[in-house]
Amino acid sequence: MSFTISTSFLQPLEISNLKSSPITSKSKVTSTSIVCSGSTDEKINNADGKSSLKALSAALALSSILVSSTVPALPASADISGLTPCKESKQFAKREKQSLKKLESSLKLYAPDSAPALAIKATMEKTKRRFDNYGKQGLLCGSDGLPHLIVSGDQRHWGEFITPGILFLYIAGWIGWVGRSYLIAIRDEKKPTQKEIIIDVPLATKLLFRGFSWPVAAYREYLNGELIDPTV
């Protein structure tokens, strides 16, 4: 896109031989054309935009390099602030020694082959096994030497809280679903209260095994509108 603007300029006066001749002026009118091209402006704007974008990307790259060079890399084991792996914790090892020492002092009070002595020995073996498992499973201990459960959702620590939590919810839902099914099954009996006091074992056993699939059954009843009693 282009357009032309015509303008005229008045030339300055020509003064020659001021002393001997009068001032003569000549005005020369000249025509000048100014051509403005829209495509040229667009090219200039695009070039300016590209150059500014390059400058911005270069600044971001430089800032990321500076930040990465100034922030120290954290050790792989110290993934949670203030916690260390239990197998490397001195306080954790100290607690294990103290627990075993107390059991050994109690063991001296009984005869070697007596029942209390055998029970204490079994407890000592369980204590050793428990501390070994804490170290092998990668649990993290604090400054007190006690294992800390990580509940932030980190996949590396799912076995500490997420998995047991889901298992707990499943078992609790299973028990509740079986109890609900039992109450629904006996509500049409002549004496339903009597069967609540004295459990019908064959019926309860049958419902107990059906309850393993309670999430699917609950979802099916929810879709059918049978999960919630509308009269309540």
UniProtKB/Swiss-Prot annotation:
<keyword id="KW-0603">Photosystem I</keyword>
<dbReference type="GO" id="GO:0009538">
    <property type="term" value="C:photosystem I reaction center"/>
</dbReference>
<keyword id="KW-0934">Plastid</keyword>
<dbReference type="GO" id="GO:0009543">
    <property type="term" value="C:chloroplast thylakoid lumen"/>
</dbReference>
<dbReference type="Pfam" id="PF02507">
    <property type="entry name" value="PSI_PsaF"/>
</dbReference>
<dbReference type="GO" id="GO:0009535">
    <property type="term" value="C:chloroplast thylakoid membrane"/>
</dbReference>
<keyword id="KW-0602">Photosynthesis</keyword>
<protein>
    <recommendedName>
        <fullName>Photosystem I reaction center subunit III, chloroplastic</fullName>
    </recommendedName>
</protein>
<comment type="similarity">
    <text>Belongs to the PsaF family.</text>
</comment>
<comment type="function">
    <text>Probably participates in efficiency of electron transfer from plastocyanin to P700 (or cytochrome c553 in algae and cyanobacteria). This plastocyanin-docking protein contributes to the specific association of plastocyanin to PSI.</text>
</comment>
<keyword id="KW-0150">Chloroplast</keyword>
<keyword id="KW-0809">Transit peptide</keyword>
<dbReference type="InterPro" id="IPR036577">
    <property type="entry name" value="PSI_PsaF_sf"/>
</dbReference>
<dbReference type="InterPro" id="IPR003666">
    <property type="entry name" value="PSI_PsaF"/>
</dbReference>
<dbReference type="GO" id="GO:0015979">
    <property type="term" value="P:photosynthesis"/>
</dbReference>
<feature type="transit peptide" description="Chloroplast">
    <location>
        <begin position="1"/>
        <end position="78"/>
    </location>
</feature>
<keyword id="KW-0793">Thylakoid</keyword>
